[in-house]
Amino acid sequence: MKKYMIKITLALAAVFALAACGGSREPGDAAGARVLRNLFQRSGVPANIVSFKKTQGREAHIGTQDVYEYWYESEIQFPDGYEAKCAEEKERGPCALLGIAEDQTFQKNEILKSEGSLHFSKTGKGWAAEDKNDY
C-alpha cells in the first residue's frame, strides 16, 4: 500500500509540474531589451542599451486578444550622439521609445536614463512583440 501511495504522489507531482510549465511565461528583461534594441535599429536610432530592467507588467484582454503591457527603466548610450526630433513624431517612434516628448540633442557617448513601455500580444508561439518577433 505504501508503494502505491508513493507512485500516486509522484504521478500527481509530475502532472502539476508539467501543467505549470505548459503556459507561456510573461516576457522578461532579456525579451524586453531585445525588443527595444530591434525597435531602435528599425527606427535608425544609433543607441546601445547600457542597462534594462522590467519594472512592472500586466496581462489584459482587449477584444478577443490577450495582451501584455510591459514597463521598463533603461539607460541608453548614444556612441555617436543623436538628434531626437520629437516634434515631428506622429506615431509611436524613437522619442516614445526613449521616453522623451521634446526635441533633444544627445552628445557623443551621452547616457539617457529613461522609462517606457512595450506591448505584446499572445500567440500560439508565445508573446509577439512590437518588433514582429515572438518571445
Locations of regions flagged by a protein language model:
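Cystatin/cathelin-like cysteine-protease inhibitor module
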Residues: 21-135
